[in-house]
Amino acid sequence: MTITPQNLIALLPLLIVGLTVVVVMLSIAWRRNHFLNATLSVIGLNAALVSLWFVGQAGAMDVTPLMRVDGFAMLYTGLVLLASLATCTFAYPWLEGYNDNKDEFYLLVLIAALGGILLANANHLASLFLGIELISLPLFGLVGYAFRQKRSLEASIKYTILSAAASSFLLFGMALVYAQSGDLSFVALGKNLGDGMLNEPLLLAGFGLMIVGLGFKLSLVPFHLWTPDVYQGAPAPVSTFLATASKIAIFGVVMRLFLYAPMGDSEAIRVVLAIIAFASIIFGNLMALSQTNIKRLLGYSSISHLGYLLVALIALQTGEMSMEAVGVYLAGYLFSSLGAFGVVSLMSSPYRGPDADSLYSYRGLFWHRPILAAVMTVMMLSLAGIPMTLGFIGKFYVLAVGVQAHLWWLVGAVVVGSASGLYYYLRVAVSLYLHAPEQPGRDAPSNWQYSAGGIVVLISALLVLVLGVWPQPLISIVRLAMPLM
């Protein structure tokens, strides 16, 4: 096929991030300069974000059989770029205290962002697999970046081995789907999967294996066992990327697959997904109740959040409100997670060995860093789904689509999960205002609010509050992003 100027405009975010990868790589080869390479990475990601405006002007189109650029792709590309940008800004002060090679960190984040953008645009099982591998491979290095710490190295090895196993399940599942349907394109799959075909054993086995592979990447029960250990062992800025960009990109492509290939029409697949959603919500919240490590706590809570999103995915056949629910919920989850992990990153910067991830490190934070404590409180309230925060709007949407689709037992799970989630989120928030220990173990820099990471954290808190009270701008953006079927 011929690549036209319109196609190149549609691929601008991908091309800009790819070019930034090359520029940063050459810059590292020429001369190691931490500030220069961090700045180049941030400029490249910002340029990719700005280019989305030009992509919108070009309109929806299929760019090669592997990719479709439309409003849906633009929304998820934007969310991935925001998460990558935040990761780079949190990493800069953290790396200032790191004595080994700093610059490769940005290179790995940029390559992972490239994978996320590819996933947001994927319209074919081949591009889905390529995107997942492109986002996973750099994460093996990022998770073990603090390799002199046993916990970080252990997390990296665990994530690498389990991720490779999950990828093999995903690939084998795709092979079985191809054997039955004769095509790997999402649109062709939708056309080829007739009424009777969804009950074919080979096809069900293929989709089942794909659910195992994708369930691992999304930390869904029972494929979640790596999540708390990897979140705890990875450096705080890397945990930010894992919790946000990685999950958002993969969930976005899964939703597009469900939109085009009506897998939800199969009763067997719906039942399996409903059981996974129920188990993720209940187990994620129950395990988070006993955690005293903030990164582990947020790891378990991310399992429950993906369970809530799965409820909206199961209800996808009932209408466009489910797509709206997923978009709003993911935006709320992104800003809340960026704020929470951002505070952990600021408290852990510059690098001084293990991160400040113990709940005790945050005890009495309000008395010497009041604004930082207020930001953390807002994030905990949003993740808990308290009214007047963006997290509440997202959770309300999920409940609404669950009721609309008559998924009563899953609605019950969302209510019970949210109620139990209140306990551990409020426990973190309350500890910020307790009597401070005489000698605090870790603390954020005194001028944290003037750093790039501090500004990102403050903007995230502001967006969570403003969009929680007035969500219409976000809802309008999500509605514009409905894929043009």
UniProtKB/Swiss-Prot annotation:
- Catalyzed chemical reaction(s): a quinone + NADH + 5 H(+)(in) = a quinol + NAD(+) + 4 H(+)(out)
Offer an example of a GO molecular function term for this protein.
NADH:ubiquinone reductase (non-electrogenic) activity
Do you know which InterPro entries this protein is assigned to? NADH-Q_OxRdtase_suN/2, ND/Mrp_TM
Query: Which top class of enzyme applies to this chain?
Result: translocase
Principal localisation:
membrane
State the EC number(s).
7.1.1.-
Instruction: Return the GO cellular component terms, semicolon-separated.
Output: plasma membrane
UniProt subcellular location: Cell inner membrane
User: Which spans are transmembrane here?
Assistant: 8-28, 35-55, 71-91, 105-125, 127-147, 159-179, 203-223, 235-255, 271-291, 297-317, 326-346, 373-393, 408-430, 455-475
One short Pfam family name for this protein? Proton_antipo_M
Which keywords does UniProt give here?
Cell inner membrane, Cell membrane, Membrane, NAD, Quinone, Translocase, Transmembrane, Transmembrane helix, Transport, Ubiquinone
Bilayer disposition of the protein:
Multi-pass membrane protein
Q: Tell me one GO biological process term.
A: ATP synthesis coupled electron transport
**KW Cell membrane (keyword) present:** yes
Please give the coiled-coil regions recorded for this protein: none
Q: Oligomeric state and partners?
A: NDH-1 is composed of 13 different subunits. Subunits NuoA, H, J, K, L, M, N constitute the membrane sector of the complex.
Family, per entry: Belongs to the complex I subunit 2 family.
Protein role: NDH-1 shuttles electrons from NADH, via FMN and iron-sulfur (Fe-S) centers, to quinones in the respiratory chain. The immediate electron acceptor for the enzyme in this species is believed to be ubiquinone. Couples the redox reaction to proton translocation (for every two electrons transferred, four hydrogen ions are translocated across the cytoplasmic membrane), and thus conserves the redox energy in a proton gradient.
NCBIfam families, alphabetically? NDH_I_N, PRK05777.1-1
Q: What is this protein called?
A: NADH-quinone oxidoreductase subunit N
Tell me the organism: Shigella sonnei (strain Ss046)
